[in-house]
C-alpha cells in the first residue's frame, strides 16, 4: 500500500445529509437547528456578530477617509502603448486619444483621467491625450523620437 493509494477506493464526495424529512431520518423536525433562537431562524448568519464579544470593527480605531474631490487617474504605461503599436492595434500613433484607449480596454471610459507612466520604452513617435504624466514618462515621451 502506498500513500497515494490510501483513499483510492473511497468516493470523492460524500452525499449531503437530507434534512427535515421526518423523525426516522435522524435530522427531522428541527433539522439539527435546535429550538427557537437566533440561529434557528432562516438567514441566521449575523455579519460581524461575535457572540456578545465586542466585534473587531468596533475594537479597532477608525482610520482615514476618501476625499470626494481627489483626482483618481487610470494608469497607462508607455511600454503598453508601444506593444499595441507593434501589434498593429494602434494604426495612427500620432493621435492616441482617450476614446481609442477605452476602445482597446486600457482605460474603463473615455471620461476617465489618464496618467502616463514611464515603464517600458517607446520606439515610435506618438501623440497622446492625457491628464498627467510622470517625470520618467515625460523624459521618454518628450525626446526627439517620442
From Swiss-Prot:
* Basic residues composition bias: residue spans: 30-39
In alphabetical order, the GO MF annotations are: rRNA binding; structural constituent of ribosome
Superkingdom, according to UniProt?
Bacteria
Q: Which GO terms describe its biological process?
A: translation
Pfam families named in the record: Ribosomal_L27A (PF00828)
Xref: InterPro entries:
Ribosomal_uL15, Ribosomal_uL15/eL18, Ribosomal_uL15/eL18_sf, Ribosomal_uL15_bac-type
What's this chain's function? Binds to the 23S rRNA.
| PANTHER family, sorted | 50S RIBOSOMAL PROTEIN L15, LARGE RIBOSOMAL SUBUNIT PROTEIN UL15M
Oligomeric state and partners? Answer: Part of the 50S ribosomal subunit.
This chain belongs to which protein, by name?
Large ribosomal subunit protein uL15
Q: Which organism is it from?
A: Anaplasma marginale (strain St. Maries)
Source taxonomy lineage? Bacteria, Pseudomonadati, Pseudomonadota, Alphaproteobacteria, Rickettsiales
Amino acid at each position: 500500500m502506498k500513500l497515494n493509494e490510501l483513499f483510492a477506493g473511497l468516493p470523492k464526495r460524500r452525499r449531503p445529509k437530507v434534512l427535515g424529512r421526518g423523525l426516522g431520518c435522524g435530522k427531522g423536525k428541527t433539522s439539527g437547528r435546535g429550538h427557537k433562537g437566533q440561529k434557528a431562524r432562516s438567514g441566521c448568519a449575523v455579519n460581524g456578530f461575535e457572540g456578545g464579544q465586542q466585534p473587531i470593527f468596533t475594537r479597532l480605531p477608525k482610520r482615514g477617509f476618501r476625499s470626494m474631490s481627489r483626482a483618481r487617474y487610470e494608469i497607462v504605461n508607455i511600454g503598453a502603448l508601444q506593444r499595441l503599436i507593434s501589434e498593429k492595434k494602434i494604426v495612427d500613433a500620432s493621435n492616441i486619444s482617450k476614446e481609442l484607449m477605452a476602445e482597446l480596454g486600457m482605460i474603463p471610459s473615455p471620461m476617465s483621467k489618464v496618467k502616463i507612466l514611464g515603464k517600458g520604452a517607446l520606439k515610435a513617435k506618438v501623440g497622446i491625450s492625457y491628464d498627467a504624466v510622470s517625470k520618467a514618462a515625460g523624459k521618454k515621451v518628450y525626446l526627439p523620437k517620442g
